[in-house]
From Swiss-Prot:
Post-translational modification: Degraded in a proteasome-independent fashion in the absence of viral infection but in a proteasome-dependent fashion following exposure to restriction sensitive virus. Autoubiquitinated in a RING finger- and UBE2D2-dependent manner. Monoubiquitinated by TRIM21. Deubiquitinated by Yersinia YopJ. Ubiquitination may not lead to proteasomal degradation.
Location of N-acetylalanine modifications: 2
Subcellular location, principal: cytoplasm
Residue positions, PTM Phosphoserine: 86
Biological processes per GO annotation: activation of innate immune response; autophagy; defense response to virus; innate immune response; positive regulation of canonical NF-kappaB signal transduction; positive regulation of MAPK cascade; positive regulation of NF-kappaB transcription factor activity; protein K63-linked ubiquitination
Zinc finger regions, RING-type: 15-59
Protein name: Tripartite motif-containing protein 5
Length: 494
């Protein structure tokens, strides 16, 4: 009932021309009302007769000045719109919000469901319309396809979102690691500079103590000389002021003493050439540090493999080896250099490890080629440590003699016309400004190089073997020689 009343009211406030709710309604003398825009357009289309026009519905003539706004209808239209836009106030589900009729038609052009009054309105005039039942299945299929497509796109979007989150997390980790590495490397640089500064200051303090000690001794000598002068002058003054007997008594000895007096000049060091401070080669230090940092990226986990238990002792963690003289054979003369190999074997790539040789008076380390782990544990003489024998090593002997072991040369290479083919061991002396407590070994298999670094001295290069011929698998090599102090493989964090 309420719906029917609402429809009747809508019919009363619907424009006969556009069939829509009245907009700015104008009323004629005949009582009919129209939208201001509709009646104005109608006036332009019709031919006026002596300034009069006719109503589009009843054709009753009226003067154009008699068009008057109908406020009452305008208010009704506003109230009606409020009711139509509020479903809880009376609008039925499935009914046109504008006309209150059932939504039974579908406008293909607008893609909306409409009622029969909407179909006849100017807004939908000429449009293709269908019963909703006729097009529902077609659009349901389309929407189902669209739904599947959107679900797939949603999955893709979620994956992209997850990828971005993962990349973001990865970047955060990388940046955090880079920050840590940068801080660590610059700390190492500062430590290097602090160490160099400390050494220079210590040298300066030693120089100061030495010079001041000598100057104090010189000052003491000058004080004794001055005191002896004072004693002699006092004796002369006493003789000159006393009697003749006092003047002449022992005068010859006094004169001889005066004649033998020689003024000793103090020992000074102004003209001595003292050590002039020179800033350390920071460029070289930084370059060495950069090279060391670069090769340390290839740090390998190396362990020791027992090869001759009678003369070498390996720790339980297989990272330390020391020499042990056989207790049951104390009189046996040791003719061999006993060593052990490291694991794993190397057949490609870049590998780096560090060895602590602190306080040892002798050691040999590097790499060697071998067909099996225990094939080359004994070397008869240090001269046999040669690349042609499969050894690329350096070592320390007699506490201070550092050497690299190169291939031997023949006497005939030095003596013209000599027929001798005897070999001269080529042991290359290595000069260390700072003795290494820790040695880094870097093997580049493809480049055929083996390099040794003095980690104790800021990573300066000790020696480098080039053009190495690796015909078999390569093993790290360690020989404690005959020194009972251990050689220890270092960890990256140590």
């Amino acid at each position: 009932m309420a719906s029917r009343i609402l429809v009747n009211i809508k019919e009363e406030v619907t424009c006969p021309i556009c069939l829509e709710l009245l907009t700015e309604p104008l009323s004629l003398d005949c009582g009919h009302s129209f939208c201001q825009a509709c009646i104005t357009a109608n006036h332009k289309e019709s031919t006026p007769h002596q300034g009069e026009r006719s109503c589009p519905l009843c054709r009753m003539s009226y003067p154009s000045e008699n068009l008057r706004p109908n406020r009452h209808l305008a208010n009704i239209v506003e109230r009606l719109k409020e009711v139509m836009l509020s479903p809880e106030k009376g609008q039925k589900v499935g009914h046109c919000a504008r006309h209150g009729e059932k939504l039974l038609l579908f406008c293909e052009q607008d893609g909306n469901v409409i009622c029969w009054l909407c179909e006849r309105s100017q807004e939908h005039r000429g449009h293709h319309t269908f019963l909703v039942e006729e097009v529902a299945e077609k659009y349901q299929e389309k929407l189902q396809v669209a739904l599947e497509m959107m679900r797939q796109k949603q999955q893709d979007a979620e994956k992209l979102e997850a990828d971005v989150r993962e990349e973001q997390a990865s970047w955060k980790i990388q940046i955090r690691n880079d920050k840590t590495n940068i801080m660590a490397e610059f700390k190492q640089l500062r430590d290097i500079l602090d160490c160099e500064e400390s050494k220079e200051l210590q040298n300066l303090e030693k120089e100061e103590k030495n010079i001041l000690k000598r100057l104090v001794q010189s000052e003491s000598d000058m004080a004794l000389q001055t005191q002896s002068m004072r004693v002699l002058i006092s004796d002369l003054e006493r003789r000159l002021q006393g009697s003749v007997l006092e003047l002449l008594q022992g005068v010859d000895d006094v004169i001889k003493r005066i004649e033998t007096v020689t003024l000793q000049k103090p020992k000074t060091f102004l003209n001595e050439k003292r050590r002039v401070f020179r800033a350390p080669d920071l460029k070289g230090m930084l370059q060495a540090f950069k090279e060391l940092t670069e090769v340390q990226r290839y740090w390998a986990h190396v362990t020791l493999v027992p090869s001759h238990p009678s003369y070498t002792v390996i720790s339980e963690d297989e990272r330390q080896v020391r020499y042990q003289f056989p207790i049951h054979q104390p009189s046996v003369k040791v003719n061999y250099f006993y060593g052990v190999l490291g694991s794993p074997s190397i057949t490609s790539g870049k590998h780096y490890w560090e060895v602590d040789v602190s306080n040892k008076r002798a050691w040999i380390l590097g790499v060697c080629v071998s067909l099996k782990y225990n094939a080359k544990w004994n070397v008869l003489r240090p001269e046999n440590y040669q690349p042609k024998n499969g050894y690329w090593v350096i070592g320390l002997q007699n506490t201070n003699n550092y050497s690299a072991f190169q291939d031997a040369v023949k006497y005939s290479d030095f003596q013209i016309g000599s027929r001798s083919t005897a070999s001269v061991p080529l042991i290359v002396p290595l000069f260390m400004t700072i003795c290494p407590n820790r040695v880094g070994v870097f093997l580049d298999y493809e480049a055929c190089t083996v390099s040794f670094f003095n980690v104790t001295n800021n990573g300066f290069l000790i020696y480098k073997f080039s053009n190495c011929h690796f015909s078999y698998p390569v093993f790290p090599y360690f020989s404690p020689v005959t020194c009972e102090l251990p050689m220890t493989l270092c960890s990256p964090s140590s």
